[in-house]
Amino acid sequence: GAISALGGLGSLPGKLGIIGGGVMGEALLSCLLSKRMYAPDSILVSDLSHERRQLLAEQYDIQTTHSNREVIEHSDVIVLSIKPQVFDSVARDFAGIVVGAPHLVISILAGVSLSRLEQAVPGWPVIRAMPNTPATVGCGMTAIAVGNRAITENVEVAQQLFSAVGDVVQVAEPLLDGVTGLSGSGPAYVAIVIESLADG
């Protein structure tokens, strides 16, 4: 499908949907656009705030919607960039979606496990990512943990996506949760990188 064929150098396949246009969602959006990994017309962002949607649409020339379901139905890669406490309501937006070509779902929600994500998402590959705070200025480190349904191409897409905001390291999920409480703290990321180098 669209996901398995990586586009030309620097560009990513298909349509990108971001659910949640807050600080992290916007940081990713702005880095992806500035590095030309996606064209503005390939990105759809959902946010409940009308003001936020208007600001993102005007500033980045992208499409926005209040409907998470619209993002889910029209995107090849879906980034969940919402607060963990609203995950259950967003999970309901996935209910009953007919599985066509599998969409890749990437979650940057702290503390929401791969197994919970996989239960919410019908048969699609899931990857968790934990960008640290400097990622908002494009010089961060993102740790990713890969779900059971994700294949190599999915991992490559996630790595390419987060390379827009800095370095990417793949870790086991417990390591990801180990830094959740310290999200944004440099030492925790150094510890992860050292441990992943030791493992690998």
Predicted regions and their residues:
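Catalytic, metal-anchored helix/loop core of enzyme active sites in primary metabolism
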Residues: 182
